[in-house]
C-alpha cells in the first residue's frame, strides 16, 4: 500500500468514533461565553496566533468557531469587515458586545454550525479557525475553509489528542482515548494539493489558573465529563498534596497550520 491509497478523512472519522466523544452543545458553550469573553483578547495564545498572520492585501476576515471573537476582534481595526461564525448564540452576543465596547463598526456575526448550510457565508480574504476544528468530518471542514478564502487560511488544531493532561486522567483512574490530532489535517491538505506551513503554539492549560479545588474540579469535569464520587475523592486527595507546578500540568500545544489560497 502507498500513501495515495489511504483515505485520511475516513481514518480521522474512524479514530474520532473510537473516542465516543460527545460534542459540546451550543447551550454548554453559551454558559461559558461571559467567562471566556472577559479574557479573550488578553491571552498569550491570541497574541501568538495573530503574530503569525499575514494581513497584507486583505480587507475581510471570516472567523469560524469564533467564540467571543478572540482572533477576529484582535485584528478588526486593520480590516474593513470581520465576520464571526459560531453555533453558540451567546458567544456571538459576546463578540458583538465587545466590538461595540471597542467602537468597531465593521464586525458582524453569523449563527452557524460546521454542519449547516454555508451557502450564505461570505467569502473573505482571510479565513481563520482557531481551536475549532475537532469536528465530525474534518475533510469537509477543510474544504469549506479553503473555499471561503480568497487569500489565506489560518487554523490551529490540537497536538497529542488530549484536552486534559493525561496525568490528571491517571489521578482519577480514567483513561480517555485521544482525539485525532493535527497530523490527519496535514495529510488531508496534501491530498487536496495544498502544502501548508506548520508551526506550534504552546500555552498554559486551562487548569493553571484555577483559584481553588472546586474551580479545578469543575474545569476537569468540563473536559472529561461529570466525575463520579470516587473520581472526585481521588482528585481532591491528589490536589491537596500536589505542588502548584503539578496542579498546573503540561502546557497545551496547538499546531498552527496555514496556507495560501493558491497551492504552493
Model-derived features with residue positions:
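Short, glycine-/aromatic-enriched active-site segment of Class I SAM-dependent methyltransferases
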Residues: 158-176
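A short SAM/SAH-binding and catalytic strip from SAM-dependent methyltransferases
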Residues: 125-139
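Short alpha-helix
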Residues: 178-193
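Class I SAM-dependent methyltransferase SAM/SAH-binding core
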Residues: 68-115
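Conserved class I S-adenosyl-L-methionine
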Residues: 1-56, 58-67
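Conserved Class I S-adenosyl-L-methionine
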Residues: 197-264
Amino acid at each position: 500500500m502507498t500513501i495515495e491509497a489511504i483515505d485520511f478523512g475516513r481514518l480521522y472519522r474512524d479514530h474520532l468514533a473510537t473516542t465516543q466523544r460527545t460534542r459540546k452543545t451550543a447551550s454548554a458553550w453559551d454558559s461559558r461565553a461571559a467567562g471566556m469573553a472577559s479574557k479573550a483578547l488578553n491571552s498569550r495564545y491570541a497574541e501568538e496566533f495573530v503574530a503569525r498572520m499575514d494581513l497584507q492585501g486583505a480587507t475581510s476576515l471570516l472567523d469560524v468557531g469564533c467564540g467571543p471573537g478572540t482572533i477576529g476582534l484582535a485584528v478588526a481595526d486593520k480590516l474593513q469587515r470581520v465576520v464571526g461564525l459560531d453555533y453558540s448564540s451567546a458567544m456571538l452576543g459576546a463578540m458583538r458586545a465587545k466590538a461595540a465596547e471597542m467602537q468597531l463598526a465593521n464586525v458582524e456575526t453569523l449563527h452557524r454550525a460546521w454542519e449547516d448550510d454555508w451557502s450564505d457565508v461570505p467569502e473573505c480574504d482571510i479565513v481563520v479557525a482557531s481551536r475549532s476544528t475537532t469536528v465530525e468530518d474534518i475533510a469537509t471542514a477543510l474544504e469549506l475553509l479553503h473555499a471561503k478564502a480568497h487569500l489565506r487560511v489560518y487554523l490551529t488544531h490540537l497536538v497529542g489528542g488530549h484536552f486534559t493532561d493525561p496525568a490528571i486522567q491517571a489521578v482519577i483512574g480514567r483513561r480517555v482515548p485521544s482525539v485525532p490530532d493535527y497530523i490527519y489535517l496535514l495529510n488531508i491538505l496534501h491530498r487536496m494539493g495544498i502544502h501548508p506551513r506548520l508551526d506550534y503554539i504552546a500555552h498554559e492549560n486551562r487548569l493553571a489558573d484555577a483559584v481553588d479545588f472546586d474551580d479545578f474540579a469543575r474545569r476537569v469535569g468540563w473536559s472529561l465529563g461529570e466525575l463520579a464520587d470516587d473520581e472526585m475523592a481521588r482528585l481532591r486527595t491528589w490536589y491537596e498534596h500536589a505542588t502548584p507546578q503539578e496542579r498546573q500540568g503540561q502546557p497545551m500545544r496547538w499546531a498552527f497550520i496555514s496556507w495560501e489560497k493558491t497551492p504552493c
